[in-house]
Regions:
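N-terminal transmembrane-helix/juxtamembrane module of multi-pass inner/ER membrane proteins
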Residues: 1-69, 112-123
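Membrane-embedded catalytic cores of phosphoryl/pyrophosphoryl-handling enzymes
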Residues: 3-6, 21-22, 123-207
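Membrane-water interface of alpha-helical transmembrane segments
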Residues: 4, 53-63, 91-96, 157-164, ...
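Hydrophobic, lipid-facing residues on alpha-helical transmembrane segments of integral membrane proteins
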Residues: 8, 12-16, 95-110, 141-145, ...
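Lipid-exposed faces of alpha-helical membrane segments in multi-pass integral membrane proteins
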Residues: 12, 65-75, 99, 103-107, ...
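Alpha-helical membrane-inserting segments
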Residues: 17, 45-46, 78, 107, ...
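Membrane-interface loops
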Residues: 29-30, 78-161
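Membrane-helix interfacial "entry" motifs
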Residues: 52-59, 85, 89, 93, ...
Length: 207
């Protein structure tokens, strides 16, 4: 069970931080008077950074890219299943990635329904739940698990390294751009990073 310790640690950090978001400095300072935790900190960061439409569009594109990456490994796993005629014979790295991707989907839907914090701005779909940043969670988790997968399935070392570096770059840009885009509070991003670390470490523990 030691191999799950790091994942459990980040998961616990996420739970504790979420509780703090619900109870510390909760004020009706959000969009349409919605309640937000860490109100002083969140509103100060939002006023400092404002909104950035380019950053928002970039993270939307990163999200599509992450889904395509997940789809590539899903297709690879399906082809292995057809060829080897047994789910147990599909590479463990791909099977475990599938489990983590399933968890991402479940958590994505769950957090969209649980309104812990609302967005600082109202988008086309009206007032939306914003904690944690599920966009950040999706991109970081998928690309974070893609890094070891790239090392295994891309035979050209230079190409594999390039793909890994691109994944890391996009992960970093996602955190920065999602924050400066203005569609999330600062604590939303922190929550998204914490749950991503939990899922990425879980994937490594499952291998």
């Amino acid at each position: 069970m030691k191999k799950y310790f790091t994942s459990a640690f980040w998961g616990l950090c996420f739970i504790i931080f979420t509780i703090l978001v619900k109870v510390i400095d909760v004020q009706a300072l959000g969009a349409e008077g919605s309640l937000i935790g860490f109100a002083g900190l969140n509103t100060a960061v939002f006023k400092l950074l404002g909104t950035n439409h380019f950053a928002y569009l970039a993270t939307q594109l990163f999200g599509v890219l992450a889904i395509l990456v997940a789809a590539v490994f899903a297709v690879l796993g399906f082809l292995q299943l057809l060829k080897r005629k047994s789910l147990l014979k599909v590479d463990r790295e791909i099977l475990m990635a599938g489990i983590v991707y399933a968890l991402v989907i479940i958590l994505y839907v769950l957090f969209e329904k649980l309104a812990i914090n609302y967005r600082p701005v109202v988008l086309d779909e009206g007032l939306e739940a914003s904690y944690p940043s599920t966009h950040t969670m999706l991109i970081l988790t998928i690309l974070g698990t893609a890094i070891p997968l790239a090392g295994k399935y891309i035979k050209n070392p230079k190409l594999a390294l390039a793909v890994k570096l691109i994944c890391i770059l996009i992960m970093c840009l996602t955190v920065i751009f999602r924050l400066i885009s203005g569609v999330h509070w600062f604590t939303d991003i922190i929550g998204g990073v914490l749950i991503s670390l939990c899922l990425i470490r879980l994937y490594k523990a499952l291998l």
